[in-house]
Amino acid sequence: MKLLIMGPPGAGKGTQAEKIVKEFGITHISTGDMFRAALKNQTPLGLKAKEYMDKGELVPDEIVIAMVEERISAPDCAKGFLLDGFPRTIPQAEALDKKLAEMGITLDGVINIEVPREELIERLTGRRVCRQCGATYHVKFNPPKVEGVCDACGGELYQRSDDSLETVSNRLDVYEAQTAPLKDYYAKTGLLKNIDGTKSIEEVFASIKNALQK
């Protein structure tokens, strides 16, 4: 099973990715993890990517594609993989298709988790973190017993700058501009599986399994 998963920040993509790889016995390829491993192991591609990252620039698509190719070629991907965090743009998707074709690999499905913008904002801006122990809470879905106070250690709870309304709105804008067009791209291939991400974790996972069996 060779899959790709996409969805906006706050859609629960990471949680579902963990469940998918466990269920199907495939390897989770997160581009973030891939970059960290390449940098840690000082691979030639990792060092190339580091040059751009150190300058605060985006790593060029051809380097990312080469890293994805290297990762997919590893023995642990022989049974299948779940690609998470790439592609993010149409040019990246086209380059990935070309590379997969060269490798003789075809995707079995593209999972797209959909959640309305208002709910994503509520999910992301409601997160609170303990300054002392790092425990996480949510003002609506997982509130502390006493507002602003950590249940575990009594530390002060705060909102990270990443979770501010302005930052969250910007992240969603970038996703909608860059990555949302991929829905049309993959819909044309017949691979796209749109999943309602507003339900419970188990219900969303059941929908994914059902969609992949069709």
Curated annotation (Swiss-Prot):
Entry binding sites for AMP: T31, R36, E57, L58, V59, G85, F86, P87, R88, Q92, R160, R171
Positions bound to ATP: G10, A11, G12, K13, G14, T15, R127, T136, Y137, K199
Compartments in which it is found: Cytoplasm
GO biological process, one term: AMP salvage
Taxonomic superkingdom: Bacteria
Region ranges (LID): 126-163
Regions that span the bilayer: none
Residues the record lists as binding Zn(2+): C130, C133, C150, C153
Region forming the signal peptide: none
Keywords attached to this entry: ATP-binding, Cytoplasm, Kinase, Metal-binding, Nucleotide biosynthesis, Nucleotide-binding, Transferase, Zinc
Catalytic activity: AMP + ATP = 2 ADP
Pathway the protein contributes to: Purine metabolism; AMP biosynthesis via salvage pathway; AMP from ADP: step 1/1
Disulfide partners: none
Enzyme class: transferase
A GO MF term: zinc ion binding
EC number(s) recorded for this UniProt protein: 2.7.4.3
Gene3D superfamilies: P-loop containing nucleotide triphosphate hydrolases
Cellular component terms per the entry's GO annotation: cytoplasm
Region ranges (NMP): 30-59
InterPro entries, A to Z: Adenyl_kin_sub (IPR006259), Adenylat/UMP-CMP_kin (IPR000850), Adenylat_kinase_CS (IPR033690), Adenylate_kinase_lid-dom (IPR007862), P-loop_NTPase (IPR027417)
Family: Belongs to the adenylate kinase family.
Assembly and binders: Monomer.
Domain remarks: Consists of three domains, a large central CORE domain and two small peripheral domains, NMPbind and LID, which undergo movements during catalysis. The LID domain closes over the site of phosphoryl transfer upon ATP binding. Assembling and dissambling the active center during each catalytic cycle provides an effective means to prevent ATP hydrolysis. Some bacteria have evolved a zinc-coordinating structure that stabilizes the LID domain.
Role played: Catalyzes the reversible transfer of the terminal phosphate group between ATP and AMP. Plays an important role in cellular energy homeostasis and in adenine nucleotide metabolism.
Protein name: Adenylate kinase
